[in-house]
Amino acid sequence: ALELLHDVSQTPNAHMITRLRLDAELWNPAPQRKPHQNGRPRVKGARRPSPKQRLDDPNTLWTTLEVEHWYGHEKRNVAIYTATCVWYKSGFQPVLIRWVLVRDPQGQYDPQTFLSTHVDHTPEQILTWFVQRWRMEVTFEETRAHLGMETQRQWSDLAIARTTPVLLGLFSLVALMANDLIP
């Protein structure tokens, strides 16, 4: 995951938003190297509290945010904490991220952490884009369950590549026609 995030963060105009583990090792960025300093350049700074530690810390300053379409609800108020840091694991390149810890004040959902490889994204943007991704995943899961998408038994790659778009197109056409027929 870190290798992919690093590659995406180095690509212009490409950003990734995904989940972050609650026990992720987070660090400050590496301090500036002094002129003529000996030794290998540092890749990370001091250790930062993990999202799990922030969640358990009574001094964490939570902000309330209203999110549209949160797990099927029209609008939902959630408590968030956000920060920027470096996500680093030995053997991988460090990745500068903005992470958002989300807690449900009503206690209906487990706490979650999301990250963006673009540190200028706001928490609202990160959560909105993640919710949009969730809706796409639900759509694909429903098409698998109801239309049998990705369960076809073709032998050639070309047949497989053609079948899925045709299934989605036909389903869209039937849905539009049904919408016109039913007042």
Predicted features along the sequence, with ranges:
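Single, function-defining residue in the core of a domain
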Residues: 1-183
